[in-house]
Amino acid sequence: MSESAPTPRRERVIVGMSGGVDSSVSALLLLQQGYQVEGLFMKNWDEDDGTEYCTAREDLADAQAVCDRIGIKLHTANFAAEYWDNVFEHFLAEYKAGRTPNPDILCNREIKFKAFLDYALMLGADLIATGHYVRRRDRDGRTELLKGLDPNKDQSYFLHAVGGEQIARSLFPVGELEKPEVRAIAEKHGLATAKKKDSTGICFIGERRFTDFLKQYLPAQPGDIETIEGKVIGRHSGLMYHTIGQRQGLGIGGLKEAGDDPWYVLGKDLQRNVLLVGQGNDHPLLFSRALLASRIYWVNPVELERPRRLRAKVRYRQSDQDCVLEKTAEGYRAVFDEPQRAVTPGQSVVFYDGDVCLGGGVIETAEAWDFGGRP
């Protein structure tokens, strides 16, 4: 598909083909670079209700069309059992415990860079490749994970739990490009996915309402909505349907004495099954000075004998925040220079040294910011 014949390489690469434009262009670029390229389409969720919420059939058809266009073989593999055991059951357990998990992070660690990698190696591959917007760099005998070149698409946050050994066996061809360039390449070469919309949301939920999906697996436990002063002002249908900083969907209204400021979720009292709320986008209890994280995964070993100044994200697409990270008896504690809004237990905090993604962990608790004095 390239204008000039590439120099052949011995390495055999199997590309995880999702049916999207990023993996499509990744396969094309690797062909142009002379690799021996094949594709593999993963099915990670079994639709047992007769509907195609994940559009798996359409995605497979698109992946096949791209592979036919560029002249490579497409394998298929079903990792639904591994996904259920290693990702989905954890997802449910976290929601049951009142936290807000991010299944994409565990999916990358357990499925795309473990089950898929192992399967590809079994097929005789030397390397795998994906359409993630990240980069890798070999330095000082180890492989580092770097942010993608396009700051609007960088996905290092979601890959922070993948180890350096797995990164070393992986290629990320679009990590050096910006999204418009990727679409332009796909269009130039007539790929069926050139104008396909990016997938959003969690695969196994698809177009369904999140609350409707969760009700299939976890029984709802309605309870009171209280102000931080202890006044009951409404009812919630289940703590698992709400997250810190949430404004929409609280169903609070008609409180004349409360004024017009919108209500936000400030916290959850799990023992009493109470949702705690307050008014105002800048409510002090929405901000944290520090957090405690556990279940830490480092891409490569990190030296933390003493507190270390780093940068961090507490959510995807957040700008990097200055902090000091230290290891304590309770876990890893990050103290931020500036107040952090809506730090959410169950979500991930990811640490950076410049463009290098060092790793991260799961937020357990957050410490409120004291606006009355020194933080």
From Swiss-Prot:
Keyword tRNA processing: yes
Residues annotated to bind ATP: G16, M17, S18, G19, G20, V21, D22, S23, M42, G131
UniProt cross-references to Pfam families, sorted A to Z: tRNA_Me_trans, tRNA_Me_trans_C, tRNA_Me_trans_M
Statement: the UniProt record of this protein carries the keyword Cytoplasm: yes
Reactions mediated catalytically: S-sulfanyl-L-cysteinyl-[protein] + uridine(34) in tRNA + AH2 + ATP = 2-thiouridine(34) in tRNA + L-cysteinyl-[protein] + A + AMP + diphosphate + H(+)
Gene Ontology annotations for the cellular component aspect, listed alphabetically: cytoplasm
Compartments (UniProt record): Cytoplasm
Domain of life: Bacteria
Residues at the catalytic site: C107, C203
Alphabetic keyword roster: ATP-binding, Cytoplasm, Disulfide bond, Nucleotide-binding, RNA-binding, Transferase, tRNA processing, tRNA-binding
Class of the enzyme per the UniProt entry, highest EC level: transferase
Region listing for Interaction with tRNA, in residue ranges: 153-155, 315-316
Molecular-function annotations in GO: ATP binding; tRNA binding; tRNA-uridine 2-sulfurtransferase activity
HAMAP family attached to this UniProt entry: tRNA_thiouridyl_MnmA (MF_00144)
PANTHER family named among the record's database cross-references: MITOCHONDRIAL TRNA-SPECIFIC 2-THIOURIDYLASE 1, TRNA 5-METHYLAMINOMETHYL-2-THIOURIDYLATE -METHYLTRANSFERASE
Job of this protein: Catalyzes the 2-thiolation of uridine at the wobble position (U34) of tRNA, leading to the formation of s(2)U34.
Name of the protein in its database record: tRNA-specific 2-thiouridylase MnmA
Lineage: Bacteria, Pseudomonadati, Pseudomonadota, Gammaproteobacteria, Pseudomonadales
Gene encoding the protein: mnmA
